[in-house]
Amino acid sequence: MSKTYHFIGIKGSGMSALALMLHQMGHKVQGSDVEKYYFTQRGLEQAGITILPFSEDNITPDMELIVGNAFRENNKEVAYALRHQIPFKRYHDFLGDFMKSFISFAVAGAHGKTSTTGLLSHVLKNITDTSYLIGDGTGRGSANAQYFVFESDEYERHFMPYHPEYSIITNIDFDHPDYFTGIADVRNAFNDYAKQVKKALFVYGEDDELKKIEAPAPIYYYGFEEGNDFIAYDITRTTNGSDFKVKHQGEVIGQFHVPAYGKHNILNATAVIANLFVAGIDTALVADHLKTFSGVKRRFTEKIINDTIIIDDFAHHPTEIVATIDAARQKYPSKEIVAIFQPHTFTRTIALLEDFACALNEADSVYLAQIYGSAREVDKGEVKVEDLAAKIIKPSQVVTVENVSPLLDHDNAVYVFMGAGDIQLYEHSFEELLANLTKNNQ
């Protein structure tokens, strides 16, 4: 039966994906959010989903309310619902109930969740009817789907309402220092989550923290080294992507190609191959559809302006920065790699300052944008982006949105914009600068 859903904070990456999914399943969907433009709203607008400013008038008692995790009691719509005793569910609680109707495939991990969820969704939807929810704001819903693929987020232990049949865990790393106290706290959260997986876990076997995970369901380890249950080997990385074989229990189960770059994407693909193999999906079909994966939003997204290659990536943790630069070097081995990075949150910048500097030294030149503070924190003046610049060995400087012209001082370069804040404003400024150069040269 069709329902009416109202999303409070509909532009969030998970919320927008869920809204799209429910819309495609035939439900009436609307939502509210701040006026600022987010890349997620394009898909909502294309689907004809109404996006409203926050107002008490948006809510009627017959609606099912889904509230984004960033919105608390000081939001006027949340306050109205509480005052009038109109029930609502948080995003993760709704998802925990929703998945009970499907055979569910989850992807968890500190890094690589969105790319791996996108890859698993792409392969499975091309083999059989599948609903999915990806952290880049993409969602697909089918009333007849047997399978549901989704991204499982560890922040504030939001994945605890989830009890999937299968789950990949890509890695464990210290992140979200505003919530987690250290790596042991992160590992404990993942261990609690792992105990809820019903049929099987697929865990990166070369991660020391992940090796400590214990769960009632069988754990299959994947990676490059002997001793893993699923081993990627005979690897060839070219400017067209990555080719490799996978063996399980000493037997070759297939030869694969992914049009993606970086070692991390070979691992992501191996996790997907392992999961679908154990779930009984034809490996030959999996290999066919891996070849056609075009990526997910804001993960190594490329464009060319005035013969200049620009890469946009969500990387906002040192591990992700290293992986993104590695991918850029694989695809463009003869070009200078210029990194433009915006630190995301003051707490993360303070906690990982040395690691950020070390990661950015993998680039040939570095430009830094001002730190993007989270809505959850206040700038106490404890760290400035210049503190990071001082620790970087490679040539580096701070740029502003108004003046990105120093980026023009490079020939034969690939420009890699990385961050989870508003780094795209800097990217757009650079694109306008390049476009104006073209006009002036005509």
Swiss-Prot record:
Broad class of the protein's primary localization: cytoplasm
Function summary: Cell wall formation.
A cellular-component GO term for this protein: cytoplasm
EC number: 6.3.2.8
Family: Belongs to the MurCDEF family.
Keywords: ATP-binding, Cell cycle, Cell division, Cell shape, Cell wall biogenesis/degradation, Cytoplasm, Ligase, Nucleotide-binding, Peptidoglycan synthesis
Membrane-traversing stretches: none
GO biological process terms on file: cell division; cell wall organization; peptidoglycan biosynthetic process; regulation of cell shape
Gene3D superfamilies reported in the protein's UniProt record: Mur ligase, C-terminal domain (3.90.190.20), Mur-like, catalytic domain (3.40.1190.10), NAD(P)-binding Rossmann-like Domain (3.40.50.720)
Binding, ATP: 109-115
Protein name: UDP-N-acetylmuramate--L-alanine ligase
Source species: Streptococcus pyogenes serotype M28 (strain MGAS6180)
Pathway: Cell wall biogenesis; peptidoglycan biosynthesis
Known catalytic reactions: UDP-N-acetyl-alpha-D-muramate + L-alanine + ATP = UDP-N-acetyl-alpha-D-muramoyl-L-alanine + ADP + phosphate + H(+)
InterPro entries: Mur-like_cat_sf, Mur_ligase_C, Mur_ligase_C_dom_sf, Mur_ligase_cen, Mur_ligase_N, MurCDEF_pg_biosynth, UDP-N-AcMur_Ala_ligase_MurC
Subcellular localization, as worded in the UniProt entry: Cytoplasm
Coiled-coil residue windows: none
Top-tier EC class: ligase
One MF annotation (Gene Ontology) recorded for this entry: UDP-N-acetylmuramate-L-alanine ligase activity
